[in-house]
């Protein structure tokens, strides 16, 4: 049988990676350049840096001195969160589209595909069904954009959106991501070769090593080292930008896509086994597991759907470790969000379709992993210095913020621009 990504992550161990930085792909030229709604400053470069899986409490001067300094010298948003489901793909989609999953088509990492009759990862370019700031800045403002994304499935989902796209390489076996060292080196090369005006970056080490950290419930040895390593590499990026005269042009928007939670080996929920044991709903639901959340898609006759869903709520809601049950409409997930969503308590995880499907200790997707760091820094004169903002912000707010900086219309987005961070 084919290993799931979470099963594979559990067996990754220590991996040595070596090789070249990789290749950069060019998107097709923009067919038309529209006039921006306001002039775009010639000296503005925007970088959206996603520190994948970083928790708000890790943004401190001991673990992440560079990021903490950037935040202290810029504007920090103290009440920032992901959108549900708190996974990588839906929150990266939210960042660049500015709209909720029901509008962009990406409610989770994994969904139940009725056509295929199985669960699958949303890693195809046509899975993303909304415009992004990567393509809009390219086509409406006539400026170069770039994506430098460490994870293979992110590169797949955003294929063709940016003017310049780095294909992550070398990929670490099992994790399907490129280490932050290679990603930052690729970013520096992309800046040197193409001078993009807006760049979308994912740094995956904190997330990947956090997933596998067997000491996650206590010392977090691997996770803490990953935070330190990533932070140092971002210091290296800053020195590069300063030495090339680009720091004064830079607006740096830094945030995570979700947090991270750790569970003991036996604190797992296997909903598939409970469904199989119940004659009323056996074979009636497909499950897409997303670590801290499961989505359930109804497979039976239409006239029995309501009764089956009521029984599913009873069965799943009674399982130890289950926190909440949602109608997907409550979370604005859209049709791919299935017919029911279950989340787990902190310190638990889902493991479906079998108890062996998700052995990794670090997971996210559930409510406790919604909190994220979020700040705006950089050397550009428009960045407000030394401020904090306590109004709620979400990953959705990145796209309208970027759109506002480049003079693009954002009235139709669900997010709100983080204008408190700028002198505009």
Model-identified regions with their sequence ranges:
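A short beta-strand-to-alpha-helix junction
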Residues: 41-42, 83-86, 124-129, 225-228, ...
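Active-site His/acidic residue clusters
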Residues: 43, 152-171, 185-236, 268
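Active-site nucleophile/metal-coordination loop of metallo-enzymes that catalyze phosphate/sulfate
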Residues: 38-43, 56-141, 156-159
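Active-site neighborhoods of enzymes that stabilize oxyanions during catalysis
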Residues: 289-401
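N-terminal secretory signal peptides
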Residues: 1-4
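C-terminal segment of N-terminal export signals and the immediately downstream linker at the start
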Residues: 23-44
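N-terminal export signals
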Residues: 7-28
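Metal-dependent active-site segment of extracytoplasmic phospho-/sulfohydrolases and closely related
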Residues: 47-48, 66, 229-271, 341, ...
